[in-house]
Every structure is written in structure tokens, then in C-alpha cells.
Amino acid sequence: MSSTDGSSGGITRRGFLKGVTAAGALGLGLSGMTSTSGWLREASAEETVEERVAYTYHQAHCGGMCPLKCTVRDGRLVMVQPNDACAMDRLKTICLKGISEVQHIYGDGRIQAPLKRVGDRGTNQFEQVSWEEALDDIASHIKQAQDTYGKNSVVVTTSSETDCVFLQAMLGAQGRGNTGIDIGYGNGLDPSMGLGGGYAMSTPEARDWVNSKLVLTVGSNFCESTLPQVRLFFEAKEAGAKMITVDPHYSTTASKSDEWIPIEPGTDAALYFGMIVHIVEQGLIDQDFMKQHTSYPFLVDVATGKLIREHEPQMVVDEEGNEAPEDGQADPFYVIDEATGAVVPYQQTTNPSLSGTVEFRGATVRTVYDLLLDSLANYSVDWASEITGIPAEKIKELAELYAEGPSSLALGWGGNDKIANADVAGHAAAVLVALTGNVGKPGTGVGVYVGGTYNCHTAALGEWALPEDMVAAENEMASYDMRTKESNAHVLIAGDDLCQHYGNMNVSTAWANSLDFIVSIDPYFTEGCKWADYVLPCTTRFENDEEYGNIKNGYNQILLQEKIIDPLFEAKTELWIQRELAKRLGFENALPATSRERVDAILSTSEDEAINTLTVDQIAENQGVWPIEGAEECRRVLEDYAFVTDSGRMEVYYDSLVDYGQALPAWEAPVEITSDNPLRETYPLQLSNVRTRFQIHNQFQNAEWIKQYYRPTIEVNPQELTSRGLQTGDAVRVFNDRGEFKVYVNGNESIRPGCARMYELAMGDFTIEGNMQSVTNDTMLERGYSLMCGPVTPFSDTLVQIEKA
């Protein structure tokens, strides 16, 4: 065996290859794979070239799932194009990341052989081993841990980019649980409508924007992070929608909008409070919508803060065997009948009163709307202006435009979503929508519109069924809490870059070092691989050992993953890896014997007859795409106002949060980036993590073609450079009490003074030194544990200082 010692297991941008030994360790003997020198050669007129075309899909994490047409010449991928068999031109999507796969999948970021750690964790010392040795040892460690500590001593974390879908249940392992990522706004918004799953994925398609008079974008950068569907933004603009973007920085989307409104980071909720106050004061509310379709008329016990219901909610078992509280039909809420003044179940009147205080069952009860009016006494438009930095007249103008409607409120997974008070902003947005009725009608909606596949038409696909006794363990806690709280986690199998998923990397690496055993499964060497005991190379979407690999929902169509090329290097498919582990653990027969068997099951086990009668061969004959019924029309939500809540209405009063003073949203400042924080004297810059066209989270940082145009850089307003004696291009140290890293700095007028901006998840192999997560905030609010998806990780609720390195 040969060993490697480098900053990325032999595969970094700094040219890890330090000799024949190192190259051999990672299987880098393929000519031309580690540099561009072997890419081009003279063509011969007599040469016979074998060329074919096959079809697959691209990444899911951006929400694009672009259907791709791939040209293969002499066994090598040479061209990637949009799939021209898509039913509509708007579905034929691709971006520079998809095009770059021609180089990327052959790049030096690939893990080319199984690697075994030979040094301390994090020191990046590995040796190449055989698949047999790696899998035997991994299976042995799993058995040993489960025999000693129980099945749930194994924790399996995966992502949509690694297809290890059977592993958690197969092993009876824990999963990752709540993620703390992309759930800030949704935690506050989604309970009001019963949609979105905590991720604010509660919107119609962005195609619906053509019906809007106003598209108000807050904390989202649609034109940067949703490249495959960016035409929808311009179609709406051309149709007459007023496009307004609220963002601390002059973002790509702001630059394409009709108007940009700068805002102080972390103050979205204050903006909504200001708009709400003005809408109420000016009588711009939609009373009919409020009475018929919201919880504003519901009565609340003034003493307890609890909603009045017929009886204490009982737990019932649904058709799938899951326990849930009784809904509003079985245990109704109460309102005041405006005609009679009587307190009645909400279903028994079509004209409930929005205001009123009465005695009922020995308690003083008031309407939710009256309680809202009381809470608004704490706010004013001038107060909102002072907090947000937005002129009071602009807040009033924005409120009037929004109330006039039809308006779409486009939120995002950047901006305030990554700040500790994000749920308050989401809740305040729900209150704003419920006052104006800007939901359920053409041109209206609220939530995250980025990523076309997140809110489009989907097919009810099935999946290969594991034996009934093969089920995942219940999660003890979210994995971010495993870092600091006692758990039974001993073995971690990561199909994702787990080190990048948490703030404050020092805590993450300390946890990693405390675990008995870590396995990383990935096509590319990531930051998390450096702490693994074994690193296993899996294939990309372009490689397979069989004709077909998987079937997934794409953007309004079903997509088939065909084999484009053979697995590169020693990479194996995720199904092969899972089957080999299952074989060693005694349950190989539980998994599909072939990929074809699995993809057949994905269709045949669907409960939708249109899907279970469809065949893989039919999709393949249509170049790997199949239109979803109804996709020619824009997908909308809640058109009948049938909210998926206990009452069937839009519920804006959360009595589960009474103890935190947030039954109705109440202003709460960020935990670190407030202007009056004494830490500002030492660390004066708010560090914002934002998304970029150049990457999908941590992916594509090692894509050579893209790296020609971007390197990890911290951007600040030029006045921040001047005050520190810095110039664009200088290497700087970015630091706070948590840690530090070094990158280049760039002066950019579009960045708000007092702020710094970086594209998210800059890994240590691509910075000058260190990892971006070394400085980010990991404070979890106690209230967060009572929210739908647990507390948000406040990556952007972070203060730093920069100085010349």
C-alpha cells in the first residue's frame, strides 16, 4: 500500500500530487485526468470514433433537476446539453454547472479509490485500500458498535446527491433529524397554512408571477440561485408585475428588479410589523378573507393565552397509523357570532366577529384579531424605519402596494432565514398575508419560490420496499445537538459533507474526534472526508454499472437516469455499496439485486395508476423524460382556501408559543449582529452567507472551469477596505472568538457598509487557509426546540473582523 499526506487526501487545487507514490495512492494514473494538458489532441481524418447519446438529470440541491442530453465519444463524456425531448421549451434547462461536468467529473476533486485513515483525524493522512478490505472493516465496526451499544449507536446522514436511501433503515440506524438549515422562515410561516414542511415551500410556481401586480422579494436572490428558471422573473416583469427586492446588498436579483430597497440585516420582521401597522391603520385589510378563512375571529382565554376549543385535544391515529391531535372538526374552535353575539363553534356561523371580549366557561375570552391589535401598540411605521433603515414613507408605499394585490411575497433561504430571529419574520409574514388575503388566488403566494422542482407538479413515485422489520431507529436528537449533548452515537456514516452543516466548526470537529468510527461516502473529497476513518468513492449522476440507475421527479416531468459512462476510477454506485454492506451484515436479499429492479419498483409501486402503468422502457424511448399530467398549466396552491391546518383556515395564533411570548409574532433582535452589541467594537462586520451561481452549496468548488471565474473571497464595501488600509486582492484574516480563516478580499460597492459577504461553505482546500465555518454562529435558541423543525442554525448572525494576513 501507498500512503498520501496532503491538504485534501491527494486531491486539492494546490496540486497535491507530490510524486509517483501519491498519484498511485488515489489511482491517478489515468493520463490527462489531473491537468488540462491531456485534454486536446490532433484529430485524424481516418480515425473511427464511437459516439453515442444518453440521458440523465443533474443536481437536486439547487432545485433545478435539469434533464440532460449527454454526448459520449470513445467512452468519455464530451458534451452536456439540455434534453431536447422535454414537452415544453421552458423545461429544457441547463446552467454553467451542468455544462462544466464535461471537466468536473474527471477533475482532481474525485475520490478515485477507497481510502483508509492512517494519521490523526483532520490531518488528512490516508492510504489506498481495496474495496474488500474497506467494506469488511466497516461492516465489522458496525457489528461491534451495534452489539455493544445497540442498533441506534449508528447514525446515517445522507443528502439528495448521494443515493444511499436504504442504509438507515437497513441498519436500524438513527438519522440526522432536524437540520437547522433553510428552516428559519418556514418555522414561523408554515404552521399558519399547513404547507411547506418547515421549509417555506408553500408557494405556487413562479410561473404564476405573471398574474401578480407586485412580486416582493425579501431575503431571496432568485436570479442568482435559480438559474434554470430565471426566465420566469423576466416574464413576470414583462407582463407588468412590479418587481421589488428588499436586501441588505445590491444582489443580482436587486439589479434586475424595478426597485431595490436596502435593509439592515436581520430586521425583516420589523419591516413586516411596519407594513402591518400601516395596513391596519389605513383600513386596507380584507375583512371577508379574515372572517371566513383565518383564525382572526377565534377566541383566546386571556388568562392562559390558549385558544378556546370544545375540549382538550385528544390524540387520534390516522389511516397510516400515525398519532396526531384531533382536528377542528372533531374539536372545534370558538368564535362570536356577529349577528347574535353568542359564542359558537366556528363552523356554525358564516359571519364571525373579528373583535369582541366576552365571558365564556368562566373565563374572559377575546378574539385573535383584538390581541393582534393590542400587540401592534408596540410598533409604528417610524419604529420600523428606525430598526430597518428603510424610510417610513417607503414602508407605507410598500404596504399599500402589497395590500392592493394580487401580490406574491417571495422569501428565501438566505438573508434573515440564517439569523436567529427568522421564525419571528416568518410568523409576521403570515400575519401580513392573512390580513390582506394575498394567498390562494392567481398572482398571490408566500414562501420560497427558488428551485423550480420544489413547487412544481410532481408524480407520486413509489420505491423499493424493505422488509417490514427493517426500520430506522427513532432519532435521539438532531445531529447538531449530538455535538454537545450526550447521545448513543458511536458510528457515523455520512453521505454528505457533515462538517459544513453546522456553525462553529471547532465544536463539529471535536465531536467528530469523539466518535468511534466515521465513514464518508461521496464522489468528491470534501471537508468532512478529512475526519473519516474510511472514504468511499461513489459514482456521479453520469456513471453507472447498469443501463439505468434511478427515477426522480424533475421540473414538471419524470426523469430517468441512464448510464452515460462506466464508473470512473474505482468508484462504485451507491446501490452496489449498500448491497455489499448488506451482504456482510446478513441481509443482502432485502435490497434490489439490480438497479433495473429498483427503477421498475419506483414506477410499479406508485399508488397513481398513471404512474404504475408506465414503464421504464417508455421513459427511455422518450429520451429519459416523461411529462407529468397537468404540467402545461401553472401549479397553484390553496385555490379553494383549504388550508392544511386543524381548522382548515390560515392560523396565525400559535398557542404552543405562549410561554415564549410568541403566540402572535413579537419583535426580537438577532442574537449577535445587533448594532448595539458590545462585540461590535471588536468584530464590527456582519458576515452574511449567500448562495451563488458558481456552486450548489459546497459542490463545484473543485470544478476547474468554474474556478477560472471565482475563488473564495470575502466582499466588503470599499470604505471598509480604506479604514483598514486594505486593497482589493489582499489576503486577509477573517476572525472572531470562535476561530479564523484566510481568503482574498474584494471591495464591492453593492455590499452594505458594516457587512461582509461570502458565498457559502468555502472549504479549507479552496481558501488560503481554514474553513469558513470556523467563525459562524451555532447558538440555538431555546424557543427553537418548540418550533416545527427545531432551532435554526444562525450562520449569518455572525460578527467578524478582517485584517491583512
Where are these regions (language model features)?
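N-terminal export/assembly segments and adjacent metallocofactor-ligating motifs
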Residues: 2-288, 292-353, 364, 382-383, ...
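N-terminal leader/propeptide and maturation segments of large enzyme subunits in energy/redox metabolism
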Residues: 113, 117-133, 284-392, 564-651, ...
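Extended redox/cofactor-interaction regions of prokaryotic respiratory oxidoreductases
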Residues: 2-3, 165-234, 239-245, 270, ...
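Glycine/threonine-rich phosphate-binding loop and adjacent beta-strand/alpha-helix elements that clamp
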Residues: 206, 542-567, 577, 582-587
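Conserved short loop/turn motifs at secondary-structure junctions
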Residues: 153-160, 384-390, 413-420, 452-453, ...
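Acidic/polar loop patches that form or flank catalytic/metal-binding clefts of enzymes
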Residues: 27, 284-289, 395, 409-410, ...
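Flexible glycine/proline-enriched surface loops and loop-helix/loop-strand junctions
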Residues: 215-218, 256-257, 364-365, 379-382, ...
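Long, contiguous, secondary-structure-rich segments that constitute the structural scaffold
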Residues: 419, 574-619, 698-700, 704-715, ...
